[in-house]
Amino acid sequence: MSGTTGERPFSDIVTSIRYWVIHSITIPALFIAGWLFVSTGLAYDVFGTPRPDEYYTQARQELPIVNNRFEAKKQVEQLIQK
């Protein structure tokens, strides 16, 4: 016979009013916080990724494609210098 872990059954947790009071506040708050994090551009600053309009400058409009894997470092350096 299996023992018990002493934890509440999941069905008791999901049907409790306390669970829904807490989660009806936290889930929308997390969604709104994530939306603000991305829409204000803070996510770009935190993770250091370029914004969509910064991928290609006016001077460089071609794709930076590496063709030869054995000379990849040299090709990347040439693409950066352009």
Curated annotation (Swiss-Prot):
With its partner (PsbF) binds heme. PSII binds additional chlorophylls, carotenoids and specific lipids. The chain crosses the membrane at residues 21-35. The keyword Iron-sulfur does not apply. GO terms for cellular component: photosystem II reaction center; plasma membrane-derived thylakoid membrane. Its cofactor is heme b. Coiled coil: none annotated. SUPFAM superfamilies: Cytochrome b559 subunits. GO terms for biological process: photosynthetic electron transport chain. It is a single-pass membrane protein. Keywords: Electron transport, Heme, Iron, Membrane, Metal-binding, Photosynthesis, Photosystem II, Thylakoid, Transmembrane, Transmembrane helix, Transport. PANTHER family: CYTOCHROME B559 SUBUNIT BETA-RELATED. Heterodimer of an alpha subunit and a beta subunit. PSII is composed of 1 copy each of membrane proteins PsbA, PsbB, PsbC, PsbD, PsbE, PsbF, PsbH, PsbI, PsbJ, PsbK, PsbL, PsbM, PsbT, PsbX, PsbY, PsbZ, Psb30/Ycf12, peripheral proteins PsbO, CyanoQ (PsbQ), PsbU, PsbV and a large number of cofactors. It forms dimeric complexes. Belongs to the PsbE/PsbF family. This is Cytochrome b559 subunit alpha. It comes from Nostoc sp. (strain PCC 7120 / SAG 25.82 / UTEX 2576).
